[in-house]
């Protein structure tokens, strides 16, 4: 044995004898021989029972964003039995923000795909695959017993014919004189009791079958003309008395409600009274959750201002002559970043206990995609030039629409901008994206005639290109006065592009 250590041996055989994976064999073999071992040594690689084969490396569903709770396996990029190296792309995972590639962290062979591609709603930490060391029998690898199966997942299935819609039809019942079939308004009940009339002798015309005061007055008129007579209730059949429950004893008289067909029922598309369920993606569910939380927990305040784009459009035309293509939205991003630098009190967030001033100026730009609204980030926007901002917006927008955004490209941000001007919207209000404190909603620029004065003081009409911007702010950290001053400074910066240099 001493000679074998001195003369050397097959590294793979050495690994099998000691019981450690090859990539970790150097440090761990030293520990087995009594040499110093760092505290970070991973002792899970000792195998007392399977000393001729190492345990497989588990591939777990990772957390790829702060808000991610589950993910979908879009596609496996490696097949079972295929060799992988650290850094190789294993599969594509759809998170709550984008489709992200999961890379291998170890060398070896992909032995088993536990969760097939197309599986959805896989919880974080669930086992999705196994990797074994090179040279091991990957075909007979077993799923570790200490890892249970992942929670139920929804896999793509063949469309099944929807059941025929079932519509409830009121069943005609024999009416017992003296009983009420309608819900009565208080005024109608008083009139009927006063004149000893029964609502069943008339017709309910109120919404959802309510017998109204007007319906009761019609019955009184019919009684006065002799067309109907007083209603005398027929004694109900004798029933064995039972002790009423406390709830029944305190409850007032109840009247049966009219049977109303359901507004919609699951069924075949285009059928009357049916609907089609639309599966929600992870992105759509997270957007719905976060927007609901924002509107219900963040006190929104709004401030609006009109900005003259005359100078911006002139600068933009000059840049086009030099083959520099930038949009009005790029100027808006730059103006917002410069204003945040001038007013750091607005560059804040709410962390649950109090305000927190942010040391960076990262602008989140809303981008519409097929899967929902995403907000890639223009980092350090105040230090970037207009052309740099334009290039960043184009690149990030394309990645967002292709579902290729990296987590660091959409996580964070200190201020958001949402522009619907390209859709012909004049103005709107946007929902704050927590923990950010503000979002700026931008409408389209439109021609407006304004009365101005020339150099000689003569009044004249001039056409101006105006846009309306509305800032939604978190009143807990940005009050109305601060929001107003911010918009005033933003307007001045945008209307004078030289300030953005």
UniProtKB/Swiss-Prot annotation:
One cellular-component annotation, GO: nucleoplasm
Cross-referenced Gene3D superfamilies, in alphabetical order?
2.40.50.100, Chloramphenicol acetyltransferase-like domain, E3-binding domain
Cite the effect that the entry attributes to residue 208 to D.
Decreased interaction with DLD
PTM entry text? Delipoylated at Lys-97 by SIRT4, delipoylation decreases the PHD complex activity.
PROSITE patterns attached to this UniProt entry: BIOTINYL_LIPOYL, LIPOYL, PSBD
Pfam families in UniProt: 2-oxoacid_dh, Biotin_lipoyl, E3_binding
Q: Where along the chain is the transit peptide annotated? A: 1-53
Q: What is its main location?
A: mitochondrion
What's the impact of mutating residue 190 to A?
A: Decreased DLD binding
Coiled-coil residue windows: none
Protein name, per record: Pyruvate dehydrogenase protein X component, mitochondrial
> Which species is the source of this protein?
Homo sapiens
């Amino acid at each position: 044995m001493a000679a074998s250590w001195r003369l050397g041996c097959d590294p793979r055989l050495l690994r099998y004898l000691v019981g450690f994976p090859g990539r970790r064999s150097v440090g761990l073999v030293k520990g087995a021989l009594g040499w110093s071992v760092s505290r970070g040594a991973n002792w899970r690689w000792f195998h007392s029972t399977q000393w001729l084969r190492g345990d497989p490396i588990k591939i777990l569903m990772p957390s790829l964003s702060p808000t991610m709770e589950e993910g979908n396996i879009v596609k496996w990029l490696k097949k079972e039995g295929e060799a992988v190296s650290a850094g190789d792309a294993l599969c594509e995972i759809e998170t709550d923000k984008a489709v992200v590639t999961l890379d291998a962290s170890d060398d070896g062979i992909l032995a088993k795909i536990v969760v097939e591609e197309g599986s959805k709603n896989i919880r974080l930490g669930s086992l999705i695959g196994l990797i074994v060391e090179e040279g091991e029998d990957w075909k007979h690898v077993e799923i570790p017993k200490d890892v249970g199966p992942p929670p139920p997942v929804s896999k793509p299935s063949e469309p099944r014919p929807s059941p025929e819609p079932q519509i409830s039809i009121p069943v005609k019942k024999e009416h017992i004189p003296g009983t009420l079939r309608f819900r009565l308004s208080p005024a109608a009940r008083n009139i009927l009791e006063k004149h000893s009339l029964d609502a069943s002798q008339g017709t309910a015309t109120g919404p959802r079958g309510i017998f109204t005061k007007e319906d009761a007055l019609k019955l009184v008129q019919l009684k006065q003309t002799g067309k109907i007579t007083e209603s005398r209730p027929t004694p109900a059949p004798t029933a064995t008395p039972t002790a009423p429950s406390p709830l029944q004893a305190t409850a007032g008289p109840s009247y049966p409600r009219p049977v109303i067909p359901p507004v919609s029922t699951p069924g075949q598309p285009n059928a009357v009274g049916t609907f089609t369920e639309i599966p929600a993606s992870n992105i759509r569910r997270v957007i719905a959750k976060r927007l609901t939380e924002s509107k219900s927990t963040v006190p929104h305040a709004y401030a609006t201002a009109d900005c003259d784009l005359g100078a911006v459009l002139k600068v933009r035309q000059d840049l086009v002559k030099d083959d520099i293509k930038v949009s009005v939205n790029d100027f808006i991003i730059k103006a917002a970043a410069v204003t945040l630098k001038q007013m750091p009190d607005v560059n804040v967030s709410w962390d649950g206990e109090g305000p927190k001033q942010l040391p960076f100026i990262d602008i989140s730009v809303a981008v519409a995609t097929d899967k929902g609204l995403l907000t890639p980030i223009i980092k350090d926007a105040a230090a970037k030039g207009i052309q740099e901002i334009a290039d960043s917006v184009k690149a990030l927008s394309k990645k967002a629409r292709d579902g290729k955004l990296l987590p660091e490209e959409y996580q964070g941000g200190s201020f958001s901008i949402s522009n619907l001007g390209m859709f012909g919207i004049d103005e709107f209000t946007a929902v704050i994206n927590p923990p950010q404190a503000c979002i700026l909603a931008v409408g389209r620029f439109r021609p407006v005639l304004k009365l101005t004065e020339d150099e000689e003081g003569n009044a004249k009409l001039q056409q101006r290109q105006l846009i309306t911007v509305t800032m939604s702010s978190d009143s807990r950290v940005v009050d109305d006065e601060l929001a107003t001053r911010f918009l005033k400074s933003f307007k001045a910066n945008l209307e004078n592009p030289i300030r953005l240099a």
